[in-house]
């Protein structure tokens, strides 16, 4: 659960700039349970 702590309660624009931490582990900001979190890999949730 602590792994998904990249873009949790951030805005879509802030999530894009705050996903630098996830970028290091090849992770992307995704939407999970109606909230933004760091995904393990580029999932199919490629929604803008």
Curated annotation (Swiss-Prot):
GO terms for cellular component: nucleosome; nucleus. Keywords: Chromosome, Developmental protein, Differentiation, DNA condensation, DNA-binding, Nucleosome core, Nucleus, Spermatogenesis. It comes from the Eukaryota. One of its GO terms (molecular function) is DNA binding. Testis. GO terms for biological process: chromosome condensation; sperm DNA condensation. Coiled coil: none annotated. Pfam families: Protamine_P1 (PF00260). It is found in: Nucleus; Chromosome. Protamines substitute for histones in the chromatin of sperm during the haploid phase of spermatogenesis. They compact sperm DNA into a highly condensed, stable and inactive complex. Belongs to the protamine P1 family. This is Sperm protamine P1. It comes from Corynorhinus townsendii. The gene is PRM1.
């Amino acid at each position: 659960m602590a792994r998904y702590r990249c873009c949790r309660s951030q805005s879509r624009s802030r999530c894009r700039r705050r996903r630098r931490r996830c970028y290091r582990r090849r992770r992307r900001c995704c939407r999970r349970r109606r909230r933004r979190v760091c995904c393990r890999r580029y999932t199919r949730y490629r929604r803008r």
